[in-house]
Amino acid sequence: MIDFSAYIQSDWAWIVLFVMAVFVGMSKTGVQGLAILTVPMLAMTFGAKPSTGLMLPVLCFADVIGVSYYRRQAEWKYIIRLLPMAVAGFFLALWVDNMIPATEFKHLMGGCLALVLAVMLWSQYKGKENILIDKWWYSPLFGLLGGFTTMIGNAAGPVMAIYLLSTRMPKMAFVGTNAWFFLCVNFLKLPFQIFAWHNINLTTLAIDACAVPFVLIGAFLGIRLVKFLPERGFRIFTTIVTIISVLVMLLV
């Protein structure tokens, strides 16, 4: 029998894990950026680096659900623009891991995202197209930020939400593109987490297996919410969740 005591030391730890699983399921099927709200709780409960190893397989499982449901909705031109620099972001995260505290980078990322979010909201308020979206550096920058933040703390939800909101694509394309991007990114991360950071093992996988039903519940709720919200309502809701997520990155 697998001993969970090295990771699960109280009932609170199970509650945090299951809440994370519900939020991850919802974020992968419609409620973008919601999963990051559980990142601080996971880090405080399990430790910063162990928590990323616990969360990643849950994310991968939820990605498969999201892609299976929205598989024909993706805008691949955006994914192709993002992926190369996202992989570069992995290596940047590995390089700075032992040099600079992750919290300092998280706050820096939060500040950058807050600035970009402000520009995007200003453009929408003025009724103009995002003035940055066609810049040659825009997609590579978000790819790098996404790869770095997802490697450091599975915290790339707000990065992608801001990027995809700035494209003004329809909600189904938004969710499908997000699902495919993170499916690619999270499965590419697995070897790094297993062999470089050694924070995924049989015990963590067994713990994650207990969270599977809660991922399914969250996925169902996310799908229902996307169907319920009109296009404008979806953008407003996603923007609000993203603002909260950026504040979490800045303040926690």
Summary of predicted features, one role per range:
Residues 14, 56, 110-113, 117, ...:
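Residues within membrane-spanning alpha-helices of integral membrane proteins
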Residues 14-80, 142-143, 147, 157-215:
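Small-residue-rich hydrophobic segments that form or flank transmembrane alpha-helices
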Residues 75-86, 108-112, 133-141, 173-180, ...:
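Cytoplasmic-side transmembrane-helix entry/capping segments in multi-pass membrane proteins
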Residues 40, 94, 98, 162, ...:
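Small-residue-mediated transmembrane helix hinge/kink sites in multi-pass secondary transporters
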Residues 1-7, 94-104, 193-206:
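Membrane-interface helix termini and inter-helical loops of multi-pass transporters
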